[in-house]
Amino acid sequence: MAKETFYITTPIYYPSGNLHIGHAYSTVAGDVIARYKRMQGYDVRYLTGTDEHGQKIQEKAQKAGKTEIEYLDEMIAGIKQLWAKLEISNDDFIRTTEERHKHVVEQVFERLLKQGDIYLGEYEGWYSVPDETYYTESQLVDPQYENGKIIGGKSPDSGHEVELVKEESYFFNISKYTDRLLEFYDQNPDFIQPPSRKNEMINNFIKPGLADLAVSRTSFNWGVHVPSNPKHVVYVWIDALVNYISALGYLSDDESLFNKYWPADIHLMAKEIVRFHSIIWPILLMALDLPLPKKVFAHGWILMKDGKMSKSKGNVVDPNILIDRYGLDATRYYLMRELPFGSDGVFTPEAFVERTNFDLANDLGNLVNRTISMVNKYFDGELPAYQGPLHELDEEMEAMALETVKSYTESMESLQFSVALSTVWKFISRTNKYIDETTPWVLAKDDSQKDMLGNVMAHLVENIRYAAVLLRPFLTHAPKEIFEQLNINNPQFMEFSSLEQYGVLTESIMVTGQPKPIFPRLDSEAEIAYIKESMQPPATEEEKEEIPSKPQIDIKDFDKVEIKAATIINAEHVKKSDKLLKIQVDLDSEQRQIVSGIAKFYTPDDIIGKKVAVVTNLKPAKLMGQKSEGMILSAEKDGVLTLVSLPSAIPNGAVIK
């Protein structure tokens, strides 16, 4: 029997700068849902990706002296590295520059044009380049006037300056779908979540009247061009939103994924783009005569004490820093526990450290440590088999375990992650109290209480197993470590279905000889200071410390170094090393193997096909037993390493001078 499918998407991110913890928040939330649904037995499809067209990308690439795709490839490599670091379990990563996407955008646009939903006209409006959005005069923030006429203002979404733009444009006649959209809302009251977002869409956008939407631009050319009128570039409303179906092969030669997974079960996004997903996207699907997604969920923002994150304010949180110093589980746990999903939440270093110390190190970590230590002390490491409840406290714990699963499930289904985790921690806290109430150290002194003592240990381990299973969608390492230390190696006992009946450990097991701390306790004062320091804005030009220069060399010394262009044709990880990649490069006249310490910044797939600069006259060396015949040039700044990429037009073997 085929599994029931579940299709979840994040927004596709705009790669015009480094991602911060707010982007990680959306993607981790999607990952939690995907992992939870897989545990429930669903056939899950989890999609994320990048929105790579538009004026801002074109300008960023030009400023960097690169082609758009060269600029994008570098940015996307960083995004994929962050997702890998967060252990995001996405099944696909869609880039809007891919042919599979471009093909769908072209066909969708021409179809809507042919059936009269799109028409050619002229547009004049206030435009924000960073937001890629037009605004009416009434929507502008801090409008500027001259002789009673608006001459400028700021975007209501980002606060960026807007400019008056007038150009020929294709328009999407969305106004004719207004009644049909409202009828859909009535028939599907849970379509937009939380409910407050639905009221906002109806009262602020639909009731005042939907204006037809400009869906093409002529003022830039980086994007998908309209096939029948190539001077027009398809605008973001169609280009970006269509990714959810282009990634499934819609209108391709193989629509099997589309037929299997569409409509989406959940579109997940931050609240500032819910309008596009709850109004424009449903209308676009109606025009294409396609089923609408089942739910659009708009979560809140991660705020700082002084408002939204901003590099200039010095309050941007880099998830890489948190993961590197405190581990992935602590970072994922904080995001899903501290911040109520659907509402805005405030990030503070103090709360991050407190959650790590109190919840993870004290409550969970100490429970595991105490339990394993007692099994070793009282039973030489052999956990007695579960016998059933021998005491009313046992009965209470068993009932609470089953009730915890029920409450947890209800919270997870409504995407109330912080509530689900709170439910688990109440159970963990109650289990810690169970130790104090049953007093194993007293029972151990009375041989007649041996069975009772063994059953207390069995209940403790079973409770820990329940908690570990429920935490699997959130924490990617701790549950595995718990199962290993308890020597629970039956995969069935790690699945959600094993929680339907309490007491599956009906045979004795040998726990680990010495428990290992899963979450080391942090020095609160030092770590709070560290996080605050990491959030400081970059130094101004006047404040930047001068990087010490190396001794000057003569041109003859530099001429000794031979640097050539090469293409990376293959790459793989070096065994037993988390830093090294073994790379094959094509220098035209020969192929060489180079071992490079870039594995923390690039995967093999990220670099295959890249044109790079290679120092070719270094003496061969051996690294981890692998021969290395050269060095690939890279740049390093603030601990982040980036390969020096060359334009593809430079032939392999060309000497760089």
Swiss-Prot record:
Keyword S-adenosyl-L-methionine: no
One MF annotation (Gene Ontology) recorded for this entry: ATP binding
Reactions catalysed: tRNA(Met) + L-methionine + ATP = L-methionyl-tRNA(Met) + AMP + diphosphate
EC number: 6.1.1.10
A GO biological-process term: methionyl-tRNA aminoacylation
One GO term describing the cellular component: cytoplasm
Binding site for ATP: K311
Domain tRNA-binding residue range list: 557-657
UniProt entry tagged with the keyword ATP-binding: yes
Keyword list, A-Z: Aminoacyl-tRNA synthetase, ATP-binding, Cytoplasm, Ligase, Nucleotide-binding, Protein biosynthesis, RNA-binding, tRNA-binding
Compartments it resides in: Cytoplasm
Ranges spanned by the short sequence motif 'HIGH' region, renumbered to the chain: 13-23
CDD domains for the chain: Anticodon_Ia_Met (cd07957), MetRS_core (cd00814), tRNA_bind_EcMetRS_like (cd02800)
Placement of sequence motif 'KMSKS' region: 308-312
Superkingdom of origin organism: Bacteria
Subunit structure comment from the entry: Homodimer.
Role of this protein: Is required not only for elongation of protein synthesis but also for the initiation of all mRNA translation through initiator tRNA(fMet) aminoacylation.
Entry-linked NCBIfam families: metG, metG_C_term, PRK12267.1
Family of this protein: Belongs to the class-I aminoacyl-tRNA synthetase family. MetG type 2B subfamily.
Annotated protein name in UniProt: Methionine--tRNA ligase
Species name: Staphylococcus aureus (strain MSSA476)
Gene this protein is translated from: metG
